[in-house]
Structure formats: C-alpha cells, structure tokens
C-alpha cells in the first residue's frame, strides 16, 4: 500500500493523522507543504481547490483529511 500525506509545520491535525497511521503500523511518505517545491507538486496534483491539511492519499486516491482518514481506517 502506498500512502502519502501532505502536511505543514505546526499543524495539530497533521500530527494526529501521522499518529493514526503510525498506530496502525502504516508506512507513509510525508510531503511538507512549507517547502516550495513540494507545495508546487501538491497544487499540480490537486489544483488549488483543496486548501486544508493534512491531505492523505492511499494508492494515489485522495482519502482527505484527518476525519476522512479515521473513517477509512475504520471501514
């Protein structure tokens, strides 16, 4: 399973989402949107419609934010 999470510095929901993934022993790749290059890739992937973080993708499908991830893990 390929998991990507887009985050920003000082984001409590980002920290919680990463904690949730870790609690389920799910490896993930983190992209920090505080970094200009990673932010550009994010907007290239999603457009500028999504403005909140975290954003989680599983196998290249957008799951959404923290609450969406929680719901996905409980399915």
For the regions a language model picked out, list residue spans one by one.
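Alpha-helical elements of the RecA-like P-loop NTPase motor core of helicases
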Residues: 15, 19, 40, 71
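Short alpha-helical
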Residues: 12, 37, 64
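Non-catalytic, surface beta->alpha helical segment in thiol-disulfide oxidoreductase systems
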Residues: 58-75
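Non-catalytic interaction surface on structured domains
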Residues: 24-27, 45, 71-72
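Structural micro-motif
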Residues: 47-56, 66-67
């Amino acid at each position: 399973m390929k998991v990507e999470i887009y985050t920003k510095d000082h984001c409590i929901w980002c920290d919680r989402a990463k904690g949730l993934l870790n609690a389920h022993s799910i490896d993930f790749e983190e992209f920090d949107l505080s970094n200009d290059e990673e932010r550009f890739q994010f907007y290239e992937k999603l457009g500028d419609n999504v403005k909140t973080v975290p954003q989680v993708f599983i196998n290249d499908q957008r799951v959404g934010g923290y609450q969406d991830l929680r719901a996905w893990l409980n399915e």
